[in-house]
Design a protein with these regions (language model features):
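A metal-dependent hydrolase metal-coordination microenvironment
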Residues: 22, 28-165, 178-180, 188-199, ...
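Substrate-binding cleft/loops of secretory-pathway carbohydrate-active enzymes
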Residues: 105, 170-182, 219-229
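C-terminal functional module detector
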Residues: 1-49, 65, 218-361
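Structural recognition of alpha->loop->beta junctions
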Residues: 175-193, 229-241
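Short acidic loop-to-helix transition motifs that present clustered carboxylates
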Residues: 167-171, 192-193, 315-316
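Glycoside hydrolase catalytic-domain groove-lining segments
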Residues: 201-208, 212
C-alpha cells in the first residue's frame, strides 16, 4: 500500500512537471532575426581609458545546500584567491542561493546561478535582489528558455548572463538567433569556449556582452582560478558600474595562459600587471581603427557569421576599411605575456543597442 501510494505520488509529480513545462509554459512567437543595420556605428569603447577598467570573476561556487551541490570551501576562500590576483570584483554564485559574505563592502556583488534542470541550462543573475525559483527540469524548448530569461529580467537592477552555453545540451547555437532579455554570454568558461554561440547571437542582431569566468568549484585549488576573467568598466569600483558595464557592452573577455610549471604567485603577479595595451578604438571615415601603446600579437578582426576579416602577426595600429556587409566587427589579440583579450563588437545601429526587449508569447 505504501509503495503504491509512493508510486502514484511520484507519477503525479512527474506528470505535473511535464504538463507545466510543455503545455502551460507560454509558446512564444519569435520575430525573424535580422543582422545589425544602420549607417552609424555603436562603439562601447568610445572613451576608453585603461585606468577605468578592473578584473572581475562572477562565477564561483562554494560548499552549500548541505553538500548536495558541487562546491568546496567558503566565500572567504573565493575572496582571498581573487584579491591576491588584484581583481576588483569577485562574486560567489552558488546554485539558487545568494551568498551574503562581505555584503557590507561597496564592491560586494549579490549573484547566483539559476537552474536545476537536467541539461544544465544555467543563467547567472548579477546584482540579484532575490532568487527566482521557477525552472523547467527536462530538456528545454526555445519557449522554455525565453520564459525563464523573461522572468529573470523582471529584476531591472540586475544583469542576466547565459552561462556556459556550449555545455551539454543546455543551449543550441540556433537558440541564440532568437533569445532576448539577457545581457551577456559566458563565452569564456573553463569547461567550454563558445565563440560560435556568441557570433550566432551577434550575426542575428543581438548585442550581448562577452563574459569570461573561471566557474571554479573549489577556490582553494589555485589551478582552478585565474584562467578566464572579464575586464569591466568601473572607474569607482561600484556594483552599479559593474552591472551597467555588463548591460552596455563595456566588457573585455580575458584568456589567461595556463602553464604547468607556472606557480600561482607568478600567475597572480601577471594578472595584477595585466595591460591590454589599447589606447584607442574608434570608427572614422568608413574605417575601424585602433592604436596600441606597444606591439600586440596575433591580432584578429571577426565579423558577420564569425568570418575572420583580418589577421596580423603583430600590430601597433589597426586600420580596416568597413564594407557594406560588415554588420559588426570585433577584435581579439594577445600581449607578449600570453594573455588574450576579446573585445565586444563595434556594430551598426539604427536605434538603441542592447538585448532587453518585450517578447510577446
Amino acid at each position: 500500500m505504501v509503495k503504491r501510494s509512493l508510486f502514484l505520488a511520484v507519477t503525479a509529480g512527474l506528470a505535473y512537471l511535464v504538463i507545466d513545462q510543455y503545455v502551460v509554459c507560454p509558446t512564444y512567437r519569435f520575430e525573424a532575426p535580422r543582422p545589425f543595420r544602420g549607417e552609424r556605428f555603436f562603439n562601447p569603447y568610445a572613451d576608453f581609458r585603461p585606468q577605468d577598467w578592473t578584473l572581475a570573476n562572477l562565477h564561483a561556487h562554494t560548499a552549500s545546500w548541505l553538500g548536495v551541490t558541487n562546491g568546496r570551501g567558503g566565500a572567504a576562500d573565493v575572496y582571498e584567491a581573487y584579491d591576491s590576483m588584484g581583481y576588483g570584483f569577485h562574486a560567489v554564485s552558488d546554485y539558487m542561493r545568494i551568498n551574503r559574505h562581505g555584503a557590507d563592502a561597496a564592491a560586494w556583488v549579490p549573484a547566483y546561478e539559476h537552474g536545476y534542470n537536467i541539461p544544465k541550462s544555467h543563467r547567472l543573475v548579477v546584482g540579484a535582489g532575490k532568487v527566482t525559483w521557477k525552472d523547467y527540469p527536462f530538456p528545454l524548448t526555445l519557449s522554455n528558455r525565453q520564459d525563464l530569461l523573461d522572468r529573470l529580467s523582471e529584476d531591472t537592477g540586475s544583469a542576466v548572463v547565459i552561462n556556459h552555453p556550449a555545455m551539454r545540451i543546455g543551449y543550441n547555437a540556433a537558440d541564440l538567433k532568437f533569445l532576448t532579455n539577457y545581457d551577456a554570454l559566458e563565452v569564456l568558461n573553463a569547461y567550454e569556449i563558445a565563440f560560435r554561440y556568441w557570433d550566432t547571437a551577434l550575426s542575428n542582431g543581438h548585442f550581448v556582452s562577452i563574459v569570461g569566468n573561471d566557474d571554479t568549484h573549489d577556490a582553494g585549488n589555485r589551478r582552478s582560478v585565474g584562467r578566464f576573467a572579464t575586464l569591466v568598466h568601473a572607474p569607482g569600483r561600484t556594483r552599479a558600474e559593474l552591472i551597467r558595464s555588463l548591460r552596455e557592452g563595456r566588457t573585455i573577455g580575458v584568456q589567461v595562459p595556463q602553464r604547468a610549471d607556472m606557480p600561482f604567485s607568478a600567475k597572480a603577479a601577471m594578472l595584477r600587471r595585466a595591460d591590454t595595451r589599447l589606447t584607442r578604438l574608434w570608427v572614422d571615415s568608413g574605417m575601424l581603427r585602433a592604436d596600441f601603446a606597444a606591439l600586440v600579437i596575433d591580432l584578429e578582426v571577426v565579423g558577420q557569421s564569425g568570418t575572420v576579416r583580418f589577421r596580423a602577426d603583430t600590430a601597433l595600429h589597426l586600420r580596416l576599411p568597413i564594407g557594406p556587409a560588415d554588420t559588426y566587427l570585433r577584435i581579439a589579440y594577445s600581449t607578449p605575456d600570453g594573455i588574450r583579450y576579446h573585445f565586444n563588437p563595434v556594430c551598426r545601429a539604427d536605434g538603441p543597442v542592447g538585448n532587453r526587449r518585450t517578447t510577446a508569447p
